[in-house]
Amino acid sequence: MGTSGQSCRLVAMLFLCPFGQIHQGGHRVPGAAYPGKFRKRGGSGLEQRLYDALQRNPIIAAIRDDAGLEKCLQADVQTVFVLYGDICGIAGIVERIKNAGKIAIVHADLIVGLATKEISVDFLHNTTRADGIISTRANMIQRAKELQMIGILRVFLIDSMALDTAFSARNLKPDAIDILPGLMPTMIRKIRQITGLPVLTGGLITEKREVMQALEAGALAISSTAPNVWQM
């Protein structure tokens, strides 16, 4: 095992052992993302900061490599979804995002070296400056809320069972539901109405028209890995 691999293993052992705005007709429209503001439901106040940021700019930069990281740091986005990294490098990725004055939310399920267990959320909380997590697992979201982090439940709408998962999120009470793919305005509207929770969406959205359709259907914000969407 090389030096990097040894360092990663040591990090894991040390931790585990002890326990918006949208352009419309050439004009920028503040608050166009969502009709009405959300108010925090207790906790650290991070939730309200996220909602306020997405009211100002409803486009979220989703990054999946270092090239995306470099581009998002220069983009006029206030919120970043981190979709890559490992236990050795995630703190550095988050640090750069935070130093740029942006909100950093890590997709905990995608970080190499982390399991989909509650202790992985503790790891991110204790070793990085991440504001919150995304996960498809209810136990991960629940732990994030216990640690006063932002918790976003991601749901892939591939069948009726997935839709039931989205509807049941009202009992889990995440800060938002992130549904993919994003080209389903009817589902966005329905999930928001039934759960009463903020809805984020993304995936396959590449044009301004698609962004506007999702926002008009009631989405709070749109996430995208495409830098051209970040500039809309």
What annotation goes with each model-predicted range?
Residues 34, 39, 43-108, 112-114, ...:
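Conserved N-terminal beta1-alpha1 strand-loop-helix module at the mouth
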Residues 59-61, 80-82, 104-108, 133-134, ...:
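Hydrophobic faces of well-ordered beta-strands that scaffold small-molecule active sites
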Residues 63-73, 117-121, 160-168, 207-210:
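Short, acidic/polar
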Residues 72, 137, 214:
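Conserved, mostly hydrophobic/aromatic
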Residues 82, 184, 204-210, 217-232:
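Glycine-rich phosphate-binding active-site loops on the catalytic face of alpha/beta enzymes
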Residues 84-97, 113-118, 135-149, 158-164, ...:
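Active-site-adjacent beta->alpha loops and helix N-cap segments on the catalytic face
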Residues 119-124, 169, 188, 206-220:
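Catalytic cores of alpha/beta
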